[in-house]
From Swiss-Prot:
Is strongly inhibited by phenylmethylsulfonyl fluoride, a serine protease inhibitor, and by mercury chloride. Diethyl pyrocarbonate, a histidine modifier, also inhibits the reaction, albeit less pronounced than phenylmethylsulfonyl fluoride. EDTA and dithiothreitol have no effect on enzyme activity. PANTHER family: ESTERASE ESTD. This is Esterase EstD. Optimum temperature is around 95 degrees Celsius. Shows >70% of its maximal activity in the pH range of 5-9. Displays a relatively high thermostability with a half-life of 1 hour at 100 degrees Celsius. Optimum pH is 7. Exhibits significant esterase activity with a preference for short acyl chain esters (C4-C8) in vitro. Its physiological function is not known. Displays neither proteolytic activity using casein as substrate, nor peptidase activity when assayed with L-leucine p-nitroanilide and L-proline p-nitroanilide. Its EC number is 3.1.1.1. It comes from Thermotoga maritima (strain ATCC 43589 / DSM 3109 / JCM 10099 / NBRC 100826 / MSB8). One of its GO terms (molecular function) is carboxylic ester hydrolase activity. Belongs to the AB hydrolase superfamily. Esterase 10 family.
Amino acid sequence: MRLTVFLSLFLGVMVFGAFDQEAFLFVQHLTSENFESALNMCSNQVKAQLSVQSLSNIWNSLKAQLSDFREIAGYEKIIQAEYEIYNFTLKFDRGEISALVTMDREGKVAGLFFKQATKTEYELPDYVDPESFEEKDITVNGLPGKITIPKGSGPFPAVVLVHGSGPNDMDETIGPNKIFKDIAYGLSSKGIIVLRYHKRTFVEKVDPTTLTVEKEVIEDALEAVKILKERKDVSRVYVLGHSLGAMLTPEIAERSKADGVVMIAPPARPLEEVMEDQLKYLQSLGLASNVEETLNILEKLKRKEIPPDEFVLGAPAKYFYDLRERDPASIAKRLTIPMLLIFGGRDYQVTEKDQEIWLKELSGRENVKILVFDDLNHLMISGEGKSTPVEYMKKGHVDKRVIDEIARWMVK
C-alpha cells in the first residue's frame, strides 16, 4: 500500500460559493468510505434510489478498476438552472476519474455520476520565461526527476526542492496546483538551477510500518545536494523545503554542508501539536469528523503512550516520535549559513505559533531573513478570508513575490 500520512497539513481544501463546502464534504465522506454520512447528505429522492450498500458497491467497483484512492485533485463548478453541479477530479493509483455531484437549492446531493476525467494542461505563471532555461531528466537515488538550467555560461546558484508530507510527485502537485513546478520554472527564469524529483513514497510501494523520516526524505535530499555540488556549472547549493520538508531542511543543510536554506511554511513544533491545532481549526469550520477520537490519539502520541510499531493516523507511532526528536529550530540556531523563512498570513496549518518560535531562535541575525505575506495560504497562493482545505482545489500559482524574494536572496 502507499503511505498517506494523516496531516491535514497537508490535507488540502477553497473559499466556498453557495454549496461548495457541502459538495466537498460529500466527496470526502465517499472517498473515506464513510458511506452512511455520505447518504445522509443526499436528498430524499436520492435516498429512495441509493443505499449505504449501493454506495459501497459503486466505490468498490471504481477501486477494482483504478486501484487505491489517493486524493481529490481539483474541482470546477457549473450552474445549471436551480442546480449546482460540481465536477471533482479523483486521483487513484491507476488513473483519474471525474465525480459529478449535483446539489439542489437546499444544499442536498441530488445526483452523483462518474465519468472519465479530462486532463488539464499546466499553464505557465506570468513570471516564467520558458525561453530562458532548459529542462532535462535526471535521477536521484533511482528516483525520476527534472533539472532546470538557465541558458548562459554560468556558473549559477542551484537549489534542491524538498517536498511536504505525503507521497508527493516532483512538482508537489496539490489539487490542480504544482507548487514545485512553479518554483522551479520561476527561479530558473531568474538564473538559478533547480533540481526536483519524485518523493520515494510516490514512486515505491512502501510498507508503512517500516517507514522512517531518514528513508522517506533525508537520504534522497542529501544525494540531490551531492549531485548539484558535483556539477561544474554550479557556484553554490541551497536547500529549499516546503511544509514538512521545510521542517527538515536545517538538518539536511547541516549534514550536506549546503550554502544556505530556504524554508517555506516551516513548522517549528512537534507534528502532534501542529495537527491538533489544524484539527480544531477544521472542526470550527465544520470540516472535521471523529475529532475527539483523533485528539485522544494525538494526546497519547505526545506522551509516547502508543507502542512505536502501532499504526495510527496513517503512520507508525515511531514516525511521530522520530520527528519529535528532530528539533528544527535548535538545529537552525546553530547553523551559520544564510537562511530565508517565508510564511503565509492565511496559513492555518503552520501558524503564528510556529512563526514566534522561529523568530525567538533566529531574530537579530544578519544572515537570516523572515518574511510574512498576509494574503498567502500554506501553498503560497494568494486569497481572501479564512483558508480551508478546499481552497487548495482552486487552480493558482505560487505568488510572484515569493519567487522574486527567493531569487534575489539566492543571487545576491
